[in-house]
Amino acid sequence: MPEGHAGNWTLERPTGTVAELHAPVGPISRRLVLVNEVDAPTLVLGSSQTGVEVAPGIDVVRRHSGGGAVLLRPGGVLWVDVLVPRGDVLWEEDVSRSTWWLGEVWASALADLGIDAVVHRGPMEPGRWGGMVCFAGVGPGEVLVGGRKSVGVSQRRDRSGARFQCAALLGWSGHEMVRLLGLTPVDEAGECLESGAGALPIRSGPLLKAFLAHLP
C-alpha cells in the first residue's frame, strides 16, 4: 500500500477487490485519503438494498453506507475515500452539513480544470429512482455540473470519525443502470437517469491532482 502525503493528509493507494476496498478500516485517528482502483466491473449496493440480481461478468458487493447502487468500472470513475477523525476542525456533527466542505473541494478542483460546478446544500432529493440508483438523486455535498450530478458522496460515521466515499463519474450510462436493476417503466427511468447524471469530460489524473491540491 504506497503511502505519501498531500498537505495535512496522509495519502494511501490500497490494493484489492472492490469488496476488500469497502471493508472497514478500523478506528479513524488521522486525516487520510484513500485513492482506490477498480479492478473489475462491480455493482456496489447501498447497505439497505436487497434482491438485486445482475448478469454474469459483473460482481456485486455491498457498502456500509446507505443510498442507491453505483456501477464501478475500471477507468469509469475516480473513487476517493476521505477519512476525518472526530474532533478534527473539519468534523461536523450535523450530518446534513458534514459533506459541504468536501463538495466545495471537488467544485474547486473542477474549476481549476475549467468546469463550473455547484455543490448541493439542500436536503436529500431522491426522486423516483434515487433509492435504487445513487446518481438518480442528489444529497448534501454532492456536486452537479450543468444541473447533472457528477460527483456522488456517501458517508459512514462511527465513534472515531467519518469515512466519506466519493465517486466522480468519468463515464455514465443511465440506460445500463436501468437494465442492470430492472427499473420500470424502462423509457421513463432511462430518460431520468440519463438527464440526472453526467460524466466529467476530463481524465482521472488531472482531477485527482486538483482535488488533492484543494484539500484543507
Functional labels for PLM-detected ranges:
Residues E53-A55, L90-V95, E176-V178, P206:
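Short, conserved charged micro-motifs
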Residues G103-G127, R156-P216:
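Long, positively charged amphipathic alpha-helical accessory segments at protein N-termini or as interdomain linkers
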Residues D116-V145:
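Beta-rich nucleic-acid/ligand-interaction surfaces
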